[in-house]
Design a protein with these regions (language model features):
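Conserved catalytic or regulatory cores that recognize and/or transform ribose-phosphate-containing ligands
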Residues: 1-179
Length: 179
């Protein structure tokens, strides 16, 4: 049994204010769970050719800011935001990375959007669950807030394969594989 086969998971977390553009943790999660056949929606590697957020585009946006070209910046970021929120729309669950030391404007909008749709939003807080913002505990079942990637991975494996799971009034599964 693999409840998560062909489910779409959105990898949500800061990109523009982190050194690696948010790539490393996303690649780690994808490789650690490759056997679950999850279809990952990754904003660092979008399955679409618009709203791309690579190093080149990030540097271009920073140049626009520096030059005061806010019209161009707004036009480009509205497209990025549109594509990213669309990925939240079509995903089945979110994996969210929160670092309390990094301002993550889009991350909180995407998390809020996914939560309003009652999607499972698995939040990993780098500083640990005990340091997670209090607001998160009012938004999400605390069982979806984690301190480490190992906990997130173990939880997803539990959801995918164990006979008895708590759906937390969020998980909904369609059997695409016939297993």
């Amino acid at each position: 049994m693999n409840r998560l086969a062909f489910n779409r998971g959105y990898l949500c977390g800061a990109m523009d204010r982190v050194v690696d553009g948010g790539v490393e943790w996303r690649e780690y999660i994808k490789s650690a769970l490759v056997d679950l056949k999850i279809l990952w929606l990754d904003p660092t590697n979008k399955p679409i050719d618009i709203g791309v957020e690579d190093l080149e585009n990030r540097e271009h946006r920073h140049r626009c800011k520096g030059a005061g070209d806010f019209d161009t910046l707004c036009t480009e970021m509205k497209l990025v935001r549109h594509v990213d929120l669309r990925m939240v729309d079509i995903c089945d669950f979110l994996v969210v990375n929160i670092d309390l030391d990094v301002h993550a404007c889009g991350t909180y909008e995407e998390l809020g959007w996914g939560n309003r749709m009652k999607k499972p939003c698995l939040v990993r807080v780098i500083q640990g669950k005990r340091n997670a913002p209090d607001w998160l505990f009012g938004m999400l079942p605390h069982q979806l807030i984690f301190s480490t990637w190992d906990e997130v991975i173990a939880y997803l494996r539990h959801i995918a394969r164990d006979d008895h799971i708590d759906h937390l009034k969020r998980w909904m599964f369609f059997n695409f594989t016939g297993e």
